[in-house]
A protein has these predicted regions:
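Catalytic center-proximal scaffold of phosphoryl-transfer enzymes
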Residues: 1-251
Length: 251
């Protein structure tokens, strides 16, 4: 579940509220599906992330596929411009989907999202742990994007040094060593004597990692066979938001 990477344009917004025609708003997408556990190791994931483009991208034959996948998108605001209506719509729908599947009695519920705190709070409200065995997981690809930002504070963009830096830190994250990554970044900042602006950027990165550390026990998630990245939603961002919303006259 995540904010859509592809933004749907809204035409004819009320200019009295400061919105101009053609300005963009962020849709919220949710997906509910059932999938069998798939055990991997940190090295399995690391190899997949850093595989060369020309290498085979075929999925292992024993990898389970999502079943009964339902996707829903909402692009809604109240009169004050708040996104609360779309959050209520998507999380209410997901809670109903989960209840209808009787998943609570059969298997754990994985809540896989980006790092937006308001979405995690909504998850607690609509999918409370007293009713569901919830495993909160930060989408690995969002965590990796922050490691790339950190790499570019120390190394030139596109350099081999930046790539090696990212691979090293991502492996630590996959091993469940988030605090070690944070300490390493801060030590490097001290040694490299980063500028004030870069230090501020680094603290934002470290803050993101620390705030989400409880959702980054990837070594445990992999051993349990849980999904750790929202590829299902990445596809939905393209098909639901770009295709269906734009066809309905929203562009």
């Amino acid at each position: 579940m995540r904010q859509a990477a592809e933004q749907a344009r809204i035409e004819g917004a009320d200019s009295d509220k400061g919105m101009r025609s053609g300005s963009k708003k962020m849709a919220l997408l949710g997906s509910v599906y059932t999938i069998d556990p798939y055990l991997r190791t940190p090295d399995d994931v690391l190899d997949a992330l850093f595989r060369q483009p020309q290498a085979s991208t075929e999925q292992p034959s024993n990898r389970p596929k999502p079943c009964f996948k339902h996707v829903r998108a909402a692009l809604m605001r109240d009169v004050a411009g708040s996104t609360t209506p779309q959050v209520e719509t998507i999380f209410g729908w997901m809670a109903q989907e989960v209840s209808e599947r009787a998943m609570a009695a059969q298997r754990p519920l994985v809540l896989l999202m980006d790092g937006q705190e308001s979405l995690w709070n909504a998850g607690l409200e609509y999918l409370p742990e007293q009713h569901f065995e919830v495993a909160e997981i930060l989408d690995l690809l969002h965590a990796v994007s922050y490691i790339w930002k950190a790499a570019h504070l120390f190394h030139p963009s596109g350099s081999g040094a930046a790539l090696r830096f990212v691979r090293k830190q991502v492996k630590r994250i996959l091993l469940g060593e988030v605090e070690r990554v944070i300490r390493s970044l801060r030590r490097m900042a001290t040694r490299r004597e980063l500028s004030k602006n870069r230090l501020e950027d680094l603290e934002q990165i470290c803050g993101y990692l620390r705030n989400n550390a409880s959702r980054m026990a990837y070594d445990e998630y992999l051993a349990a066979g849980y999904p750790i990245a929202s590829g299902v939603i990445e596809g939905a961002c393209r098909t639901v938001v770009n295709d269906r919303m734009e066809r309905s006259g929203m562009s």
